[in-house]
Amino acid sequence: MASSPNAPGSHSHTSISTVNPPPPAHTNQGLEIPLETLVSHLLASKRSLSSISTVWRANEIVTSAKNALEESAILQAKTRFLQSGINEQMKTLLKVRKTVEFVYNDGQEDFSNVLHNLDAADARLESTMNMLRSTMVDAAFRPAGEEPRNLLDFVDEQGVEKMRDGLKELIDESKEAEAAFGTSILSFDSDIRSLKSGFKNSKRKTSSYSPIPNHLYTLEGHAQEMASLLSSLSSHFDLCLNAIRHTEGGYAAVRNAASNPPPGAEPVSVSGVMSNSHDDINEAPLTEHEREEMFSILEKDAAEVEDVVMELHDRQNEMEAKHDAILDHVSHLAEQFRHTASVYKTLEGVYQRLPRYILAGHDFRARWEDTKVHINEQMNELEGMRLFYENYLSSYDGLILEVHRRTVAEEKARSIAKKAMEQINKIYDIDVKERNDFKFDVGDYLPVDLYPGISEAPPKWDFRLVEDEEGGSSTPLLERSVVKESFKRDRERHRNSKDN
């Protein structure tokens, strides 16, 4: 009886013994098969030969599977080659990305340091300007009735503001360059993320296992067994045909049965199989023993024809299933290759944009270096302005100390002049007294016209401040607290100068 083929390449458990008929163990004397039964067996055998289509299909499946095996090997090789190339190019891209990021971070750090130094310089300048702003010019230096003014009122602040505006423009340009570079990096990162995602999905779909070799082995086993089964059916048909030939009236009965099939039965064509005349057959008659042996084998095989046909179809169905699995696997490999090729296409696009990303880094660095030079120049000017204001404030304190020194000098001169006048006045009084005493002692004896100046008073001396030709006034008088504060600041400056 037929059994479904469960193991790959398993041999059929259904066989028709007419392939190489073994000698029967015993024979039944007088075994005969009715002509009607022989005709039925022949027609059934002829119908079974239509199963040759399953064998043809089996051969087609095996050929297709072999082609699929070759195609799968090519697809896997191409996919692995692309994946290997993508992997290496990804490493190169990541190195370039690291370099670009270094340029960006280095520029940011340098920019931050420059801004820090600039802020510090501006803060120092502003502090100095605030000191000028808070230092009021002593009223003693200014015309009477003038509104109070600070030191900053006597200098032009527009230069500082213009310098600050220029620095703001430079900083804005640097930020724009940084933003443009940052946008380029974000685009680069987006490209790399897309590549990583696509490549990750591509590798996830990749599998080194292929079911095709095992399936092909099974398919070849089925095809070989089906060919063997078909050969058995063909031998059985030949045996049936031989039995008809050696049975009187067999040809006529076959033609009649083929021409008038029972209702629902599949028509069978026997043209080309049966000769037109039994008399045309010139064959040696069978011995009784050969006839009985033939009928015994025929009867046994006829009972298994339907099972053999069923097994052929079962094997074909299993082959179709495995063939579908093979085609699905090849389709999966093709899809995987297409996806990998798509990733590679994306990679090509990234490499087309790569020079732009690299040039963005070079442009950012060049622009920043140029801007940094201008910022440093402006920063030096700020520092120069601060030093000018510092010297201005220091000079004002020096002016106060100088005025104080002059005041002290004038006071000393005035004191000396006062003391001198006191001595001169004493000498004058003594001179007057001496002159009077002389006149009293000798005045009666000396003629008046002998020395007309004998009666003159002594000359008088006077010490006074001589104003200059331009009518300059005396040194202004400063409050002691003002002088003290200036002296304190000046001493602090000298101390800081020695420390530095």
Swiss-Prot record:
Pfam families: ATG17_like (PF04108)
GO cellular component: Atg1/ULK1 kinase complex; phagophore assembly site membrane
Coiled-coil residue windows: 157-181, 292-322
Taxonomic superkingdom: Eukaryota
Bilayer disposition of the protein: Peripheral membrane protein
Gene Ontology molecular function: molecular adaptor activity; protein kinase activator activity
Key words, A-Z: Autophagy, Coiled coil, Cytoplasm, Membrane
Protein location: Cytoplasm; Preautophagosomal structure membrane
PANTHER family per record: AUTOPHAGY-RELATED PROTEIN 17
Family: Belongs to the ATG17 family.
Function: Autophagy-specific protein that functions in response to autophagy-inducing signals as a scaffold to recruit other ATG proteins to organize pre-autophagosomal structure (PAS) formation. Modulates the timing and magnitude of the autophagy response, such as the size of the sequestering vesicles. Plays particularly a role in pexophagy and nucleophagy.
Designated name of the protein: Autophagy-related protein 17
Gene source species: Botryotinia fuckeliana (strain B05.10) (Noble rot fungus)
